[in-house]
Design a protein with these regions (language model features):
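"A position-specific structural signal for the A-helix of alpha-solenoid helical repeats
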Residues: 1, 31-34, 48, 68, ...
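Residue at a conserved register position within TPR or TPR-like alpha-solenoid repeats
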Residues: 2, 36, 53, 73, ...
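TPR-repeat structural position
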Residues: 8, 25, 42-43, 72, ...
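Canonical positions in the second alpha-helix
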Residues: 18, 35, 53, 82-90, ...
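Short coil turns that delineate tetratricopeptide repeat
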Residues: 23, 40, 58, 94-95, ...
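Start-of-helix register in tetratricopeptide repeats
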Residues: 27, 44, 64, 95-99, ...
Length: 425
């Protein structure tokens, strides 16, 4: 089929069907370009091809940067040029001009925020052609959701739900559209807006029972821990990060769900991120992958929004110890308001010396002077353990002590370098 797609219309349509069924097919772009060259003015072929290319583009999670020139770009160009070649009657035909415009709009959405203005125009034109198509309203809602415009996302999904519900009531049982994606996005948008009652109504239609929390958000009890993927940048303090400071990467954090789409971050970030331990966050309903953790499949969801920053103070530290576990033993002496998280511990040398990095996680209402006293007392009682937490003294307004802590940080890293625990700078 692939060697004929640019000359044989049947082969072109068969190719579009192939990649719709198998969007991970390794050979897509070059044959698709030949189809566009051969049948760019054929609306049926371009509708099928652009829709299939969108399935390919969807294989890349929406929290990842789009390809500079990928399947969405090819679909957008094909749909746009074909639409421009239509006659007036075809342009306003939902089955022709309408589908070309919605495929163009979806392609532009997947190409990134810099194309949002053109995407909005394409969605508006598609809906002007056929405002009764519930799925087109749903797709407009996806654009608004991923750009953080949750009021507009809620409005679009409510319109989608009304139209698809009406279509479902008129269809035979086997032909009824699934309302699940729309209900999920209704719940997500309502949660983002603090409209907990509306979110609960959507969850209940999906068979999820919950209640309203004191904050007016949905609460579903006994949900298992899940994971959240967040983009991170380098931290300007410390040499534990092997990546360049401006390199963007992902970290996977544990979250405790409060509902199927929001919850509290339970692990601190290693690098700098928009979220951290204690934040209440919103995530999308489609996991980017599944992780196997202790025999359980754990979904990893992409971050959508921060609903409420946590009150906790997350203070970075660096330390060295001669006996493994000394720093963890110290944590028990800092009080119930303080947790200690070590996320990077280097392999010890022959004498057992090791360097480690982590964060102190301090309750928002904790007395920092008491934490300082407890920390300094515990450190004095432990030979072979050194720790530098400059930001603790900065928060206390003790500039001289903060300066000494910064110097201690550098001293710890230089000592680790001499021992071969860190690469030489």
């Amino acid at each position: 089929v692939l060697d004929k797609v640019g000359q044989d219309r049947g082969a072109a349509l068969a190719f579009a069907e192939l990649i719709a069924v198998d969007p991970s097919h390794p050979d897509v772009i070059a044959p698709a370009e030949r189809v566009v060259l051969g049948f760019g003015a054929d609306a049926e072929v371009m509708i099928a091809l652009s829709a299939s290319l969108l399935r390919v583009a969807e294989q890349r999670p929406p929290d990842e940067p789009p390809f500079e020139k990928g399947p969405a770009h090819l679909a957008a160009g094909a749909a746009q040029r074909c639409f421009e070649g239509l006659g007036a009657a075809e342009r306003t035909d939902p089955a022709i001009g309408g589908y070309l415009q919605i495929n163009l709009a979806d392609s532009l959405r997947m190409m990134g925020p810099e194309h949002d203005e053109d995407a909005m125009q394409a969605y508006q034109l598609a809906l002007a052609i056929d405002g009764n198509n519930g799925w087109w309203w749903f797709q407009l809602g996806l654009l608004h959701k991923w750009r953080g415009r949750f009021r507009e996302a809620l409005d679009a999904n409510q319109k989608a739900f009304a139209r698809l519900s009406r279509a479902a009531s008129q269809a035979s049982e086997g032909a009824r559209p699934s309302l699940k994606p729309v209900l999920w996005n209704l719940a997500i948008s309502a949660t983002a807006l603090g409209e907990g009652k509306l979110a609960l109504e959507a969850w209940e239609q999906l068979g999820v029972r919950g209640s309203l929390s004191g904050a007016g958000l949905p609460y579903v009890a006994d949900m298992p821990a899940m994971q959240l993927r967040v983009a991170t940048l380098g931290e300007e303090t410390g040499r534990n990060d092997p990546l360049p400071q401006k390199a963007v990467t992902f970290e996977v954090l544990w979250v405790q769900p409060l509902s199927p789409c929001h919850g509290v971050v339970q692990s601190p970030t290693v690098r700098r991120a928009s979220v951290d331990y204690g934040d209440v966050v919103l995530w999308d309903g489609a996991p980017v992958r599944m992780n196997e953790v202790e025999g359980r499949a754990v979904p990893v969801f992409p971050l959508l929004w921060i609903l409420r920053p946590g009150a906790e103070k997350r203070l970075r530290f660096v330390g060295m110890e001669k006996t493994r576990g000394t720093i963890e033993a110290l944590a028990g002496e800092l009080g119930d308001e303080v947790e200690l998280s070590v996320f990077d511990r280097r392999t010890p040398d022959a004498e057992g010396n090791t360097i480690f990095y982590g964060k102190l996680l301090i309750a928002g209402d904790a007395d920092l002077s008491r934490v300082r006293q407890a920390l300094e007392t515990a450190l004095r009682a432990r030979q072979g353990l050194t720790l530098a937490v400059p930001s603790l003294y900065e928060l206390l307004g003790d500039t001289p002590a903060a300066g000494k802590a910064h110097q201690a940080w550098g001293g710890i890293e230089r000592a680790a370098e001499k021992l071969g625990l860190l690469p030489r700078g």
